[in-house]
Amino acid sequence: IDLEHWHAFDFISHEYEDVIVNLHVFHASVSASQLSGIKKPWSWYAREQLSSLNFPKANQSMLQKLQWPQRIKIAEDLATLQQLDPDQMLYWRVAITPERVMQLQQLPIELLSKLIINQELWSQLNELQQQTIRTLHLKQSQLVALQAGQLLRGYRYIAACHDLATLQQAEQIGCEAALLSPVLATPTHPGTETLGWEQFQQLATQVQIPVFALGGLKTEDLSYAQGRHAYGIAGISNI
């Protein structure tokens, strides 16, 4: 098939006992008409189905990047990391200061893989921390300033979006997921115009990356959100 929208996603080098395997991983957008032209032996699987398939060891890091949790907790307290459920990650939404960098340096390395931080904060970390924190957040202002090919290969990006233009921008430059908000009213942003579920669904169905619903949600809303084309939900409280 003739792919028009694609980008390099990762490069993986894995050493077996008798051979070194180099994998070049790409993301591509495939239209419905193109999908109908893809026949056996090719098969398509949802992300959540991949863990049940038998892949070689070389593919494991790629599979980990493709697997997103269904709930993203947003907090300023790093202690929240130790309270996460298996299907959660923490987006540490804080002002970028030297004190915040020092806080990260005091965390056990094994906890960092569950953490999402803004790209600007990530850029101030040491090499080991940068290699461990593989999920980076983009504010909308950062998102619109970037072009395809400028994201770091081997890292996955999740972008803050509020409309179709920014969702499409996130997809086009190679973001792996998006936070679309505000879906419902929130105490932290009273009076802000909300999308509502109907508009959220209309927007989310127009891109091929996972879209997380953000704004006024709680854990009990997950199933309903997924019925509205959300991959998962995110929020400050009750998530």
Where are these regions (language model features)?
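NUDIX/MutT-family hydrolases
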Residues: V25-H27, Q34-Q67
